[in-house]
């Protein structure tokens, strides 16, 4: 599991934890828990939702770790918009791919703030950012955990000061699978599905040595500029 600190955002959401699991055996049970938790009420419902308070992403549709990180950063930037004047030009992709947001002009991070989202919460907003279209139902179906998911990326929008060990233990209590390093993400990429979703078939016709890298760049760029255009 990797952890990233984004101090410019409200402390309740400023620590991001991402983990990659392969050979996941309980995807249907994860989906069932998510659905049941969303329908429960009272203290029991609060506890059930806290136990599955993660973003679950179909890892076979991720082309790199940067793909996920850019979607996470874009989600936070949309949820907690800047209060300063808008920049004349959008930041270069290289700045987003290696995000340093400490200098961004954001609303006060000392206040408890609720994120602004177009969907139900930050987790579904993340799935929407990963999708090339704005159909929330479609983005959840494609990019969220499904009954046949075996490679799963798990995201925690955590609080400043959260113990990394406790976050990981909470993930393991939900996901039955093998934790692997993010350097292995590209091994599981389902390029046939990625090509269809992001409409990359024209790049396949190039048949150049760096075709895969060009497609990877195209996917990341699509996610990076989604909230700009």
UniProtKB/Swiss-Prot annotation:
Q: Name one Pfam family in it.
A: CGI-121
Q: How does it assemble?
A: Component of the EKC/KEOPS complex composed of at least BUD32, CGI121, GON7, KAE1 and PCC1; the whole complex dimerizes.
Tell me the SUPFAM superfamilies matching this sequence.
PF0523-like (SSF143870)
Q: Which InterPro entries does the record associate with it?
A: CGI121/TPRKB, CGI121/TPRKB_sf
An example GO biological process term is: tRNA threonylcarbamoyladenosine modification
Cellular component, GO, one term: chromosome, telomeric region
Family membership, please give it. Belongs to the CGI121/TPRKB family.
Entry annotated with the keyword DNA repair:
no
Q: What is its main location?
A: nucleus
Q: Which UniProt keywords apply?
A: Activator, Chromosome, Nucleus, Telomere, Transcription, Transcription regulation, tRNA processing
Region of interest (Disordered), ranges: 87-120
* Protein task: Component of the EKC/KEOPS complex that is required for the formation of a threonylcarbamoyl group on adenosine at position 37 (t(6)A37) in tRNAs that read codons beginning with adenine. The complex is probably involved in the transfer of the threonylcarbamoyl moiety of threonylcarbamoyl-AMP (TC-AMP) to the N6 group of A37. CGI121 acts as an allosteric effector that regulates the t(6)A activity of the complex. The EKC/KEOPS complex also promotes both telomere uncapping and telomere elongation. The complex is required for efficient recruitment of transcriptional coactivators.
Q: Where is the protein localized?
A: Nucleus; Chromosome, Telomere
Q: Which gene encodes it?
A: CGI121
Name recorded for this polypeptide: EKC/KEOPS complex subunit CGI121
